[in-house]
Each structure stands twice: as structure tokens, then as C-alpha cells.
Amino acid sequence: MESTSCPRKTYAVYNTPYLTEGLTLLPGYGRMQGVVFRRDNPRFQHCQSVAEAMNAAAADPDCLMVNRNAGSGTRALVDRLLEGARPAGYMHQAKSHNAVAVAVAQDRADWGMAIDTVARQYGLGFLPVQPERYDFVIPASRADRPAVRRFVGLLRGETGQRLLRELGFDPSPV
């Protein structure tokens, strides 16, 4: 599986509508969301696009998905792609990208939505859906605290930027 770069101009943004007064958005890093599956799963072996993978999953009632938890950005993306469909396993919810990948890798589910870095970590197949930003929300009243300032320094510093790139993320703030 190839690393997927995240073009800054096409990031999906889920979090800004939830910001309330007194909260500050700290741009984080880019990552790629996509459909994950076991490479040896015959349903997905020849799929070249997300549409093909979704159609393959929908065509087989025994094909189980593992979903993300309601309220997560990934769940919003999944629901948009499914357009109201509720495939087998839809109610099986995982709370993290790693949990989705583990369920698929352990054959407890056939497919799910996770980020490319996690798919690589578990040796899963990956079909990119869209890049997104992972941002941080900080109460404005705490922005000057030493721990917050150190975190921002790490995130924006040369070492932090290099480490994010090595992990497959796009550290460029938007």
C-alpha cells in the first residue's frame, strides 16, 4: 500500500461548526480516510474504487462492516457515503481507527473506515476516500499555559513536523 499525501486545499473539516465561544481551534495535521479491508478478502481484492468496494459490500448480506461511533467525524463521513443504507454490522461501533483496523484484521468484520496510517500498521487493504484535518480545540483561557505552549511548540517545531511526516501525516497547518 502506498502512502497517501493529503493535499491541503481539499481537507474535509468536521469540527468548526461545534466550536463555541471561548474555544480556539489549533490546526493539527492532515490524514487520509478510507475503506479498510483484509487483503485476502475476495469481495474487495479487485476493487479499484470506494464505489466498487461499497457495492461489493452491499451485494453480500454476509459482508460485515465495523462502524465508527456516532458523533465522530469518521461516522459522519460513513453516513454520507452510505446515503441512508444500513449494511450488516452498521450498529457495531468502534471508538477509534485502531479498533476498526483490529476488528477487520481479526476477521470480526470485513470492512470499515479508518485512516491510511492505521491500515498500513495492520497490513490492511486501503481505498482512499478523502483527506481530512485532525485539529485540536483549546479553551482560550488556557492557551498561555506552559503545557499548551509546549504542545504547540512540539506540533509546529521541526522535530514534531518531521515525526508527523515519518508517520504518514501532513503536518502543514492550514
Please report, for each region that a protein language model flagged, where it lies by residue.
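Short beta-strand-to-loop elements that line the ligand-binding cleft
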Residues: 68, 86-99
